[in-house]
UniProtKB/Swiss-Prot annotation:
Its EC number is 4.2.1.17, 5.1.2.3, 1.1.1.35. It holds the Pfam family 3HCDH_N. NCBIfam families: FadJ, PRK11154.1. Catalyzes the formation of a hydroxyacyl-CoA by addition of water on enoyl-CoA. Also exhibits 3-hydroxyacyl-CoA epimerase and 3-hydroxyacyl-CoA dehydrogenase activities. This is Fatty acid oxidation complex subunit alpha.
Length: 687
């Protein structure tokens, strides 16, 4: 065996070379700049013995991952575009050497095969993957504001055709084994136990390239077909990205250039565009977010070790309760008991759980047997039957302080001695909910966002006497549910709702001043939010906003006083999407601004401001409030504030979050902006 640290190879009796990748002292394989010399040495040795080798299998020495991608620190270490381009060219050169070997090369894939890992696999003649749920293939570079820089933009379209390649590269989606096989990304998907044997069989085959179908050729290889596809792809992508993600145009350019000018020039363009993107502020912000998320995954929320959780209880069978029950089973793999005061509520929760599982079944993510097994993990009760076995109870009843206090008392009386009570409140102080509790140290806030299965953030809110063990336990549970938890101080609005409120209030003021509904939403969509503020009000519910705003005003002062809009809409039964009309009127899946709203609110709609001014009027109060939250210790760090805003309310990720955005603007420019807007519109813009 030739040992080169992360890369070692040997040859078996069938004259198959086995190249094993096993990065020392790391759980996951990642491609690092320092490995270039090691890979070069291994390839030199293999090429020297090529007359005695019939095929090559590339495999991982890790138990559950192939290659998770390239080490992102390599890009951060690049001082300029020239260094970034050299980095990409080095990867391209090494992978080209693998492609040029005179015998068949096979990637034997088990576990994540992402980014540079998939680009390595694409340089092989064949790809064989395990059919295990751990196995996922993808090119997620676009999510970091980059593009695949080691041949991915050139090899994937040539392998599977233009349309599916665009879908994979532009979205950064991860493919499961069945989908990868169907698309032709892999040549076989087999049980993990026989992966090596099947890979060896492929290694003994002749070198082969997949032939595109006539339809794929027509779309990919002739200029007319290509022009149609690229034109449509650019329109669709930019409609979604609104020019805020330069990686999208760069990806389209690289693929089109390669198909038009050939592989060599395509690779050159790929390296150039990779280097340009690596230097953009958008990529820097997205990579910073990636590092923040990676760092946060290691944190427990406190110094205490979390308790083991097997059984979870949920109080309330509504949308929130049903969603919490679902992720506790489907993601966290817990057994759940859900309690509601009547069977209708329980039925709603069962249906909610079933419908989401059935969606997974239809997408072939789970089998029918797995669906049935996960349905059996949910038990519904109308009394406190079985609560003695529950480790954590998550309360998701109405926003009523007395009711929540009653739930605390009942659970601590009916449950096990050390049961944790987590309240999913969006506005009520956790300390007040814990008043009179037998064990206040076991009470904590756990604020989910709707819809639970889609929204990634959870706010963990300890009150003054919540124990460290309680904090670390619910943080661990939230992570198991697939959530990103941030620990925030017990104060009105916590963090996310507190910074959202002034943003929404400013949008309402703009509406009352005559800015049309669709113009307001478009302005913030252009800024980078996934949903405009008026649409968001409809989604959340006008009545919910009306309940939260007075609480914030009472606790935090006049700057949270909301315009006189909400009650008028509520009196007219305009609660938003759930009642089919709010600011918009909803017909099936379509919506349009309801012109009657203008009459109701005595508004003459006429746009007076630029979209940029509209956006800044809404965003600046949010930034000011975020800074106050940090100064008051509501959040522990700028990092937590950025993550909370991005994953809780959709603050534009390419800006890095409110604090990264403020740092990018600079203290002087931000202060000038605030003063200018304060002079025009009022003191609420002054920090």
């Amino acid at each position: 065996m030739k040992n080169t640290s992360a890369f070692a190879w040997t040859k078996d009796d069938e004259q198959i070379a086995w190249l094993t990748i096993d990065v020392p002292n790391e759980k996951m394989n990642t491609l690092q700049a320092a490995f270039a010399e090691q890979v070069t040495q291994v390839l030199d040795e293999i090429e020297e013995q090529q007359a005695h080798i019939k095929g090559l299998v590339i495999q991982s020495g890790k138990p559950d991952n192939f290659i998770a991608g390239a080490d992102i620190n390599m890009i951060a270490n690049c001082q300029n575009a020239s260094e970034a381009q050299a980095l990409a060219e080095k990867g391209q050169h090494l992978f080209q050497r693998i492609e040029d070997l005179p015998f068949a090369t096979v990637a034997a894939i088990h576990g994540p095969c992402l980014g540079g890992g998939l680009e390595l696999a694409l340089a092989c003649d064949y790809r064989v993957c395990s059919d295990d749920n751990k196995t996922k293939l993808g090119l997620p570079e676009v999510q970091l504001g980059l593009l695949p820089g080691s041949g991915g933009t050139q090899r994937l379209p040539r392998l599977i055709g233009l349309l599916p390649s665009l879908d994979i590269i532009l979205t950064g989606k991860q493919l499961r084994p069945k989908t990868a096989l169907k698309l032709g990304v892999v040549d076989a998907s087999v049980p993990h136990t026989i992966l090596s044997r099947i890979a060896a069989d492929f290694a003994l085959k002749k070198k082969a390239k997949r032939k595109l179908t006539a339809k794929e050729w027509g779309l990919s290889r002739n200029p007319l077909g290509r022009n149609v596809i690229f034109s449509q792809a650019e329109k669709q992508a930019q409609k979604k990205a609104r020019g805020n993600y330069p990686a999208i145009a760069a990806i389209l350019d690289c693929i089109e250039h390669g198909l038009d000018k050939g592989m060599k020039k395509g690779l050159q363009r790929e390296a150039e565009q990779f280097a340009r993107l690596a230097m953009t502020p958008e990529s820097a912000a997205l990579r910073s977010l990636f590092f923040a998320m990676t760092e946060m995954k290691k944190e427990k929320g406190s110094d205490a070790e979390p308790k083991s959780i097997d059984y979870v209880g949920v109080l309330g069978g509504g949308l929130m309760g049903g969603g919490i029950a679902h992720v506790s089973i489907a993601k966290a793999k817990k057994k759940v008991t859900i309690k509601d005061i009547n069977n209708d509520g329980l039925l709603n929760a069962y249906q909610y759980h079933y419908q989401r599982l059935d969606t997974l079944r239809k997408r072939r993510i789970i089998s029918k047997a797995q669906l049935q097994q996960q349905m059996l993990q949910l038990t519904g009760v109308t009394e406190f039957d079985g609560f003695k076995k529950l480790d954590v109870v998550v309360e998701a009843v109405f926003e009523d302080l007395n009711l929540k206090q009653e739930m605390v008392k009942a659970v601590q009386e009916q449950g096990k001695e050390d049961v944790i009570f987590a309240t999913n409140t969006s506005s009520l102080p956790i300390g007040q909910i814990a008043e009179g509790a037998q064990k206040p140290e076991n009470i904590v806030g756990l604020h989910y966002f709707s819809p639970v299965e889609k929204m990634p953030l959870v706010e963990v809110i300890p009150h003054a006497t919540t124990s460290d063990e309680t904090i670390s336990t619910v943080v661990a549970l939230a992570k198991q549910q697939g959530k990103t938890p941030i620990v925030v101080k017990d104060s009105a609005g916590f963090y996310v709702n507190r910074i959202l409120a002034p943003y929404m209030n400013e949008a309402a003021r703009l509406l009352l001043a005559g800015e049309p509904i669709e113009v307001l939403d478009e302005a913030l969509l252009d800024f980078g939010f996934p949903v405009g503020p008026i649409s968001l009000l409809d989604e959340v519910g006008v009545d919910i906003g009306a309940k939260i705003m007075p609480i914030l005003e009472a606790e935090l002062g006049d700057r949270f006083r909301s315009p006189d809009v909400f009650q008028t809409l509520i009196d007219d039964k305009r609660l938003g999407k759930k009642t089919k009309r709010g600011f918009y009127v909803y017909k099936g899946k379509k919506k349009e601004p309801d012109q009657e709203v203008y009459t109701l609110l005595n508004i003459k709609p006429q746009s007076q401001l630029s979209k940029n001014e509209i956006a800044m009027r809404c965003v600046l109060p949010m930034l000011a409030e975020a800074k106050r939250c940090l100064d008051e210790g509501i959040i522990a760090s700028e990092r937590d504030g950025d993550i909370g805003a991005i994953f809780g309310i959709g603050f534009p990720p390419f800006l890095g979050g409110p604090f990264t955005y403020m740092n990018t603007l600079g203290e002087e420019k931000l202060a000038t902006l605030m003063r200018n807007y304060a002079d025009k519109y009022g003191d609420r813009f002054i920090e």
